[in-house]
Amino acid sequence: MFAVEMKFEVPVCTSCGKEITPREHATHFVCPNCGEAIIWRCESCRVLSVPYKCPKCGWEGP
């Protein structure tokens, strides 16, 4: 039998830096300004409208 090793990157909220769990009602989208970076938002930051900043272009959103 073969052992299979799977590696994946856990998404992190762009606003607070918290790891996003699979059961959380989070969202992700492409930066509306540059279209290059993926912005992740955890449920808490979405509900509280915590600002976020694009890691590529620095654009800030609500």
Curated annotation (Swiss-Prot):
Pfam families, per database record: HVO_2753_ZBP
Gene3D superfamilies (UniProt xref): 2.20.28.10
Record's cofactor remark: Binds 2 zinc ions per subunit.
Annotated binding of Zn(2+) 1, by residue: C13, C16, C42, C45
Keywords: Metal-binding, Zinc, Zinc-finger
Obligatory cofactor(s): Zn(2+)
InterPro entries: HVO_2753-like (IPR044720), HVO_2753-like_ZBP (IPR011668)
GO molecular function annotation: zinc ion binding
Positions with a binding annotation for Zn(2+) 2: C31, C34, C54, C57
Subunit structure: Crystallized in association with 70S ribosomes.
Identification of the protein by name: Double zinc ribbon protein TK0111
